[in-house]
Amino acid sequence: MMNIALYLDAGIHQGGWRHPEAVSSGGTNWPLFRRIAQQAEAAKLDMIFVADKLAIDDIYGGDLSATVRSRPQGWSEPLTLLAALAAVTDRIGLGGTVSSSYSLPYTTARQLANIDHLSGGRAAWNLVTSVSDAEARNFGRDSHYSHAERYAR
């Protein structure tokens, strides 16, 4: 059996502004996310997937101010967005990323269980351990956990 998921990542591509129908707030635009989710469900896709990273990509050589100036768009936190999408869809699965390195097990389980209950059993979890020192700094650490530490958590 084949399952088809939509990677819901609207409006964050750096060159996306050049498209004539582009919106500048794509990463946090609720009407856009709602419309895409409903269209995916109408097309009989199996799941919507929302990825996450807990830091702004550092693509400007370690200069955070240049990164912030050059990448003004934000993006939605997956579990909050999926809870909202549960209310405007009926069948499509709702999958989101949560980092085991920087999220507490009880809180994560509670949030995912809540989405699962609200959606009638449609929640899915993309478990990641995160990848960067930038993410670690957002949680009071100087550097990211070692590979062994990440997988021991």
What are these model-derived regions, one by one?
Residues M1-V88:
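N-terminal beta1-alpha1-beta2 module of alpha/beta enzyme domains
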Residues A86-T89, G96, Y102, S119:
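Generic hydrophobic/packing signal
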